[in-house]
Amino acid sequence: SDEFDGYTLSPQWQWHANINDKWAYYAGDRSMVRLYSYPVPDNYKSLWDVPNLLLQKTPSDNFTATMKLTFRPNPKYKGERTGLVVMGMDYAGLILENTEQGTVLSQIACRKADRGGTEKTNDSVAVKDSTLYLRVKFSADGSKVKGTDDLLVRCNFSYSLDGKKFRPLGETFQAREGKWIGAKVGTFCTRPAIRTNDGGWTDVDW
């Protein structure tokens, strides 16, 4: 939770790697943080390899996280991405990407990301609005993953154009406690490994 009213990050936020000033601008007077589209590493396989993930620890096994963001990709490039991600050795999220067909919102998942796993797209929808509300609901009822002592935590994703009516997208993501330890939720803004200074950005309100 954060309204981004300051000119530095609140302590609950952490970058996925050592901070680089080129990743973000903290506009406290506008109550938002701007994430600049930053090139992925040359050896990129998944978000596990991306340093400019802005994340915070999950507070419990039952809660809802909602993020309002405005995506401004550079029309010269294709493949710039942003979104809401639940990050761990397995991860899933709602990802906005500028493509040849326009902006597409996808629900993605990646198993064994720490071992070189690749992303899978579960569902996609074309969107025309630049501002969206992205949501993930975490839920656990105490049940365990079959054959283990791992707590079964389910994540369900949805999105909204107005912040009121949310539409589900994609599949339920199951996070096991063994991989759940240290899991975080947050956002990012990336582009393919294009080394120029005129990429797009994402403004995150909260």
Which ranges hold each PLM region?
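Extracellular glycan-recognition regions
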Residues: 1-206
